[in-house]
Amino acid sequence: MIYQGNRITVSLLDDGIANMQFNAEGESVNKFDAETNKQFDEAVSALEKADNVKGLIVTSSKGVFIAGADITEFVSHFNKEAAEIEKWIVDINGVFNRFEDLPFPKVAAINGAALGGGCEMTLVCEYRVMGDKAQIGLPETQLGIFPGFGGSVRTPRVIGIDNAVELIATGKAQKPAEALKLGLVDAVVAQDDLQEAAVDLVKKCIAGDLDWQAKREEKLQPVKLNQLEQTMAFSTAKAAIFAKANPKQYPAPAIAIETIEKHVNLGRDEAIKVEAAGFAKAAKTPQAESLVGLFLNDQTVKKLAKQHTKNAHDINEAAVLGAGIMGGGIAYQAASKGLPIIMKDIKSEQLDLGMGEASKLLGKMVERKKMTPAQMGETLSRIRPTLNYGDFGETDIVIEAVVENPKVKHAVLKEVEGLVKDNAILASNTSTISITYLATVLERPENFVGMHFFNPVHRMPLVEVIRGEKSSEEAIATTVALAQRMGKVPVVVNDCPGFLVNRVLFPYFGAFDLLLKQGADFVHVDKVMEKFGWPMGPAYLIDVVGLDTGVHGAEVMAEGFPDRMKPDYKGAIKHLFENNRLGQKNGVGFYKYEKDSRGKPKKTADDATYALLKDTTDTDNQQFDDQTIIDRMMLAFCNETVRCLEDNIVATPSEADMAMIMGVGFPAFRGGPCRYIDQVGLDNYLALCEKYAHLGKAYEAPQKIRDMAAAGETFYPKA
């Protein structure tokens, strides 16, 4: 044994070939945390002293090769000064460079995901062999940073500038065939043959059949392109990348490209220093703080959901009441994940609509070659459309997705409860109606919960699981488990009108209505909020949701929270609805919609809208600058999020932030409403609340904000 650690071992195989194996004891995956970095340094030192090693393979004992750096440890470094971050990165790179400089050939045997630091570990080897089930990539820009362990230096020298820029700037993981085509790996073999193939490559290097030293030398020298070729490569890459991501919102890809451009004409050691400076620059951006925080929040939400499933019942068959687009979407989602589901409606045309929706979604999967026609048929066969309850006796969970009317829901829920087994779970897909209220007609309210999917079901990852006053932990656990099985991210919330997401969204629409009443232009407001980072502005969003849905939801919310959600005037949204402008569903809302050449609705501002809005606009129109619009819209949204934490509707800032990003498209690079408040600063945020408090209760600072500001606290403590 050349080196023995609890993260890394280096053993000698036959013929002078060593095996550096990453094997983090007690961990499900290998990653570059502080202890692994320490042992990597020690292992390299041992190899530098070994005189009996002729070549080396790098392997993993886990299903994952190396998942990358430990993000939880990264956060503590990001709060340091840029110079300290640079030094930390340069020091780690010193070990990677020493490994690369070892006087014998090295081959990485990539058996699973080699991401971030894992990919960078393979790049310090001369050759890379990849298993046919593995993946490789540099996803750091998705966290607001970019590769810091030499990845931005070595990839342009291995796969070319244009390919390297795309790999790093998009953060997309590569499948084996893609990686081979790029030149990121040298061979793809069956998983079972991986170590043998890696050893064979090392033997060829030792025998002189492969010039491994030339391969290494390429990575140590500047990129071999003249200035004109470099300029063309970078110009093309920048145009492609910036068309996909706004560098003001997501600066990491731009910083990565700028950094690569600075170091491509340098040797490795100098280039590494440039990379470290670029990494520190990206790490100090608020977007990096937000996106790394988002990654950690995602882990937190998944852990909490897993804890909720401890008492879950087995689910062998589900049912959905109400077909149509929503029911069809729920049925599709269940069936596509292998779960048999009954879809019941009282009208055959609704069943046809539901099956049509499922068929359409599956057809698109076939078109994209993500599914074969045979698999599509098999998936569709898991959905059983029916007009009666004959098959409900053995169903484990029934999702009610009928019209958003409490009387109809009461009737349907009461009826189905008498037809299912005693321990079957009933879940309502209501978006606003109290679960506790809906449970009043049930004999077994403990088996009843809310399960709020977002539209379109196949695209929106969030499911709110709502706990009513009498909902049992088993019912919550089973519903959370079902959401996970359907490929969704469940967040458990307590019952109130609108639950979490809609309760927060409606004050945002209220703030929009008030701005329009006071003279703001809806097109201008949309542009400002889209520039802020929302995928669509509030006018466009309510058009997509449907003004009828919005008005109905607003009435429910006004009844639940009259102090801040019941306006004393008729707003633009209600006025347009009363004039039969429903949004995209009938072609006219705030905007007018016409189909483009691909059949997609295209919006244009409509003179008829402006004419109608004169009826709801104050005579003394005000002009609003962009920051005022942002402040007023975001205060209403963020204040209600904080009130949901105060009222224990949602348990943690992590869950609140993830729900808003996944449920309504809160700008991911801002990290969620709680992270946004932290970045504005609690004192500054409180001052904004006081500035706009005269507009109404929705703008007044929640007590939690006052208390936190007084105590100098934040939602996310600084590491």
Curated annotation (Swiss-Prot):
Residues 313-719 are annotated as: 3-hydroxyacyl-CoA dehydrogenase. Its EC number is 4.2.1.17, 5.1.2.3, 5.3.3.8, 1.1.1.35. Gene3D superfamilies: 1.10.1040.50, 2-enoyl-CoA Hydratase, Chain A, domain 1, NAD(P)-binding Rossmann-like Domain. Keywords: Fatty acid metabolism, Isomerase, Lipid degradation, Lipid metabolism, Lyase, Multifunctional enzyme, NAD, Oxidoreductase. One of its GO terms (biological process) is fatty acid beta-oxidation. Pfam families: 3HCDH, 3HCDH_N, ECH_1. CDD domains: crotonase-like. Residues 1-190 are annotated as: Enoyl-CoA hydratase/isomerase. NAD(+) binds at M326, D345, V402, V403, E404, K409, S431, N455. InterPro entries: 3-OHacyl-CoA_DH_CS, 3-OHacyl-CoA_DH_NAD-bd, 3HC_DH_C, 6-PGluconate_DH-like_C_sf, ClpP/crotonase-like_dom_sf, Enoyl-CoA_hydra/iso, FA_oxidation_alpha_subunit, FadB. The keyword Lyase applies. Heterotetramer of two alpha chains (FadB) and two beta chains (FadA). This is Fatty acid oxidation complex subunit alpha. The gene is fadB.
